[in-house]
Amino acid sequence: MKNILKISISVALLSFGLNLSAAEDYSKLDVKKECDVKTNGVEKVIQTAEKYNKIAIEHGVEFMRFGMKNSQYIDASKEAIKSGAKEIELLDEKAKPTGEKVSIEFATWRACSFAISALTQEAQANK
C-alpha cells in the first residue's frame, strides 16, 4: 500500500513538473519562425496553429479578431486547402460572411500567429 502511495505521489509530482515546464516553453516560441508560410508551407503552419490553438482554448485564451475566433480561421483555412481555394471569406460575430476575403496564406499565418501569441502573452502575464 505504501508503494502505491509513493508511486502515485511521484507520478503526480512528475506530471506537475512537466506541465509547468511546458508552460514556460510558450514564452520562448518564435511566431515568425513557426508561422512562416513560405518556409514551412501552408499545411505545416495550419497544423502548428491547430496544435497551439487547442492549448489556448483549454487555457481560455483563444484570440478573436473582428468577431471571428481563431478556430474559425483554422477551419476556414483547412477547408480552403481541401477545396483548393485561394482565399477565405471573413465572418462576423454571428458567423455570417462579411464580404471581405483574404488569401489562404494570410489566413493561415494569422491563425498560427494568433494561437502562439495567445500562449506567449498568457505565459508573460503569469510571470
Q: Which residues does each PLM region occupy?
A:
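Classic N-terminal secretory signal peptides
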Residues: M1-A23
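Long, charged/polar, soluble alpha-helical segments
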Residues: S21-K127
